[in-house]
């Protein structure tokens, strides 16, 4: 038998929000599956350490510091990827910001604006240069946006977070329809409760939340970032070659009840 070829062998991937949580798990998995990866986030020290770790394992990896809520930063991240590796084949857009459980009628405008800028504008800013790069290469590509179960049902978080994650699904279906004929696939993942810095903070502020969520989930536990990363890697691979405009729910069954 020959060695198994990685899902993403010889592909060039850009991963945003890669300094922690799902994004950090993603860069490791993509590299192990054979991709050259460019990781981006706001924390340079964390990114540099992640890239050093990947290179020590024999992966092709680079990083660029960027805040994708700024359109020029998103453009720069894509341009860096193309300059460094020659093209862009796959992109994983992951930015997430919530606001605890602040009641809607008590929420200030800046909180709403911050959530929408991070969760929606950040995806929009990434999609434009990513799609442009894939069109320029003529080889198509695959983009995966990160929504959440909050994009499917009303979850026990602030209303603007639910709104923003529904919007991400629109930013998935629209481009999927518009660019499918160009060989560009756009899908979304909708993770359930997943261990990350943000979720850990939320659990700390709401001590009973994790147990309550487990009771409402057929698989009564919190997902590990690696489990979410596996779903996104499949969507970015040619094994999902006829999948576009879809949302892959990775929530242990939370939304089926």
UniProtKB/Swiss-Prot annotation:
**Entry EC no(s):** 1.1.1.413
Give the multimer and partner information. Answer: Homodimer.
Top-rank taxon of the source lineage equals: Bacteria
Q: Which Pfam families match?
A: adh_short_C2
| Identification of the protein by name | A-factor type gamma-butyrolactone 1'-reductase (1S-forming)
Which reactions does this protein catalyse? Answer: a (3R,4R)-3-[(1S)-1-hydroxyalkyl]-4-(hydroxymethyl)oxolan-2-one + NADP(+) = a (3R,4R)-3-alkanoyl-4-(hydroxymethyl)oxolan-2-one + NADPH + H(+)
- Leading EC class: oxidoreductase
Keywords noted in UniProt: NADP, Oxidoreductase
Q: What does the record note about the induction of this protein?
A: Constitutively expressed.
Q: Which family does it belong to?
A: Belongs to the short-chain dehydrogenases/reductases (SDR) family.
One molecular function GO term is: oxidoreductase activity
Q: How does activity depend on pH?
A: Optimum pH is 7.5.
Q: What happens when the gene is disrupted?
A: Deletion mutant cannot produce VB or virginiamycin.
Thermal effects:
Optimum temperature is 25 degrees Celsius.
Signal found in the keyword field: no
What PANTHER family does its record include? DEHYDROGENASES, SHORT CHAIN (PTHR24321), ESTRADIOL 17-BETA-DEHYDROGENASE 8-RELATED (PTHR24321:SF8)
Is this entry keyworded Oxidoreductase?
yes
